[in-house]
Regions:
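Short acidic DE-rich linear segments
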Residues: 158-174
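Long, compositionally biased
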Residues: 126-156
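A structural signal for alpha-helix termini and helix-coil/disorder junctions
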Residues: 66, 70, 144-147, 160
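An amphipathic, hydrophobic-aromatic interaction surface with interspersed Lys/Arg
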Residues: 1-135, 174
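Intrinsically disordered, low-complexity regulatory regions of eukaryotic regulatory proteins
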Residues: 92, 148-150, 166-170
């Protein structure tokens, strides 16, 4: 799955140069429960000083932030009222990716963060495209991400003519 350029960070830790590849989802879940030293050892395979461990954890955080902030990997979102459910899903995204990609949930945990985000985005879009309500939801999700108004659509909606200045300096409305 090489559709997205993946950030790799080069570091010198413990006197050695290493390149951190994008972390797997399983490692990210484990990292949340570990000390910086344990997490750094998980990602590098080396026992490191406290400073180097923090450096590695910061680098991993940068890779995750890069993957999450990429516009091409953004999962569509549109707020909607839903019945309040007293439980929280912890692996809903992983289950969605597993069903979409024909993988098992454990296989999903072995994906790196970039591949996971790409598949999650595609799974959400694919699932929403299946119904009229979902297609409307996708259009609304797209609409709220736009930062520049579509002036032609606004003019049409409010029946406003476009002002055009000709070469001779006269103004006309079209």
């Amino acid at each position: 799955m090489d559709k997205v350029k993946k950030l790799k960070i080069s570091l010198t830790v413990g006197g050695e140069s290493i390149v951190l590849s994008p972390p797997k989802m399983s490692a990210l879940y484990l990292m949340a429960e570990m000390s910086p030293a344990q997490a750094a050892e998980l990602f590098t395979g080396m026992k490191l000083s406290e400073t180097d461990s923090l450096l590695v954890c910061e680098a991993v955080s940068q890779v995750v932030e890069d993957a999450v902030s990429r516009p091409e990997l953004a999962v569509p979102y549109y707020p909607e009222k839903q019945e309040e459910i007293p439980f929280e899903l912890f692996t809903g995204g992983e289950k969605l990716v597993a069903e979409y990609a024909g993988m098992s949930v454990p296989e999903v945990f072995e994906l790196d963060i970039y591949d996971f985000r790409m598949l999650l985005r595609d799974a959400v879009i694919y699932n929403k495209m299946q119904t009229d309500k979902g297609r409307k939801w996708l259009k609304d999700a797209y609409r709220i991400t736009q930062t520049v108004p579509d002036m032609d659509k606004l003019r049409k909606k409010f029946d406003i003519k476009k002002r055009v200045i000709s070469e001779d300096g006269t103004e006309e409305k079209r």
